[in-house]
Amino acid sequence: MPSLLISVLFLHIAIYIINTIGASTIDSLLWLIYTKLPTSASCMAREQHQMKLEVVQLKREMNATSSQDEFAKWAKLRRRHDKALEEYEVKNKQFSRFKSLFDVAVKALRWAGTSGLILLLQFWFSKTPIFTLPPSWIPWQVEWVLSFPRAPMGTVSIQVWGGACAVMVALVGEAIGATVRYLYGSKDSMEAIKVGAGAVEKEKKRQ
């Protein structure tokens, strides 16, 4: 089944990308995007930000006011600050609770769309061969391993194909990462050489 073969491959690529970037980084990015949309979360985020600015502003005014020379003004600012701080803490708790629910939902959807979907495919298509091997191409013992656990003999099961995809994607990802690091390292080395050569030329001109 070519479609199943490609689907499993792309799922493992998606899992590798998520693990490489970091699930927490992706969650933070999704939360940032979500709070920019016209939703209740964006309204709550704006209210929280405004309350925080108000608390900070009142705190600055309090610090700039003498509690001895301008006690009445200072006391009024103190009451306003305490009230604003209390309202901010209530709003911040609501916002944090909403964000926690969002993180749980994102984690559940991410697992269901990647690892959970792979497990479902492996269970549902456990008897379906990914592709068929040529007859008498390899020993029957190897054929049995490749068809494990429930695919017909002489075929490759979805479990074996999934494991091969995971290994292949990891190796390719490591190779790409090593290449990028090498290229950036070479670029930094060339810049260091150029800087060193420029310093030598300047020193020669001074002499």
From Swiss-Prot:
Keyword Transmembrane helix part of the UniProt annotation: yes
Subcellular location, principal: endoplasmic reticulum
Summary of the function given for this chain in its UniProt record: Required for the post-translational delivery of tail-anchored (TA) proteins to the endoplasmic reticulum. Acts as a membrane receptor for soluble GET3, which recognizes and selectively binds the transmembrane domain of TA proteins in the cytosol.
Membrane-spanning ranges: 5-24, 111-131, 156-172
Residue ranges that the UniProt entry lists as topological domain Cytoplasmic: 25-110, 173-207
Organism listed in the record: Paracoccidioides lutzii (strain ATCC MYA-826 / Pb01) (Paracoccidioides brasiliensis)
Gene Ontology terms, MF aspect: protein-membrane adaptor activity
Record flagged with keyword Transmembrane: yes
Gene name of the record: GET1
Family membership: Belongs to the WRB/GET1 family.
Entry's localization field: Endoplasmic reticulum membrane
Keywords tagged on the record: Coiled coil, Endoplasmic reticulum, Membrane, Transmembrane, Transmembrane helix, Transport
Lineage: Eukaryota, Fungi, Dikarya, Ascomycota, Pezizomycotina
Lumenal face of the membrane: 1-4, 132-155
Coiled coil start-end: 44-97
CC annotations in GO: endoplasmic reticulum membrane; GET complex
Subunit structure: Interacts with GET3.
One Pfam family it belongs to: CHD5
Designated name of the protein: Protein GET1
BP GO terms, sorted: tail-anchored membrane protein insertion into ER membrane
Membrane topology, from the record: Multi-pass membrane protein
